[in-house]
């Protein structure tokens, strides 16, 4: 019961405050006397100070948000000359970007399939390039260390397992280098 009474009294106080604020606002607008004009002058200066204080305050905006907005604007503000230059670059043209009928929507499944196929082709091309470089490296190793390998073959403990182990060691030797280093090693010996 006491909590309900407290709640009611708080409600009354808040309504009284609202009424008082309204009354003071009405009385300020109704009175035009000299004493009220001095008070209104003080209020005007206070309001001007508040406005002055508000103007230099900048809201909390992250720089990344502003950069993203400017990037979005830059993307959409390409002129015709830039578009023509980009159209002449082969990597920026696809059958989807150079289609004539823009009213027909792009089939996203076809785009995804095309991307997957091109990704597989790229992986295959990289794998074949790497295997060619590895083969060239192995040939280089055999040229430089062929006599030692022949000495291994004539040894009494040499068998078929030894050939597999030796071949795997030589293949794994190519993994010591990254692609660029392996290319430079192979090219320097040619």
UniProtKB/Swiss-Prot annotation:
Compartment(s) of residence: Nucleus, Nucleolus
Q: Which family does it belong to?
A: Belongs to the RSA3 family.
PANTHER family annotated for this entry?
RIBOSOME ASSEMBLY PROTEIN 3
This entry carries the following GO cellular component terms, namely:
nucleolus; preribosome, large subunit precursor
Provide the function of this protein: Required for efficient biogenesis of the 60S ribosomal subunit.
Q: What is this protein called?
A: Ribosome assembly protein 3
**According to the UniProt entry, which residue ranges have a biased composition of type Basic residues?**
9-23
What would be the name of the gene that encodes this protein?
RSA3
Q: Where is this region: Disordered?
A: 1-72
Q: Which domain of life is it from?
A: Eukaryota
Q: Which GO terms describe its biological process?
A: ribosomal large subunit assembly
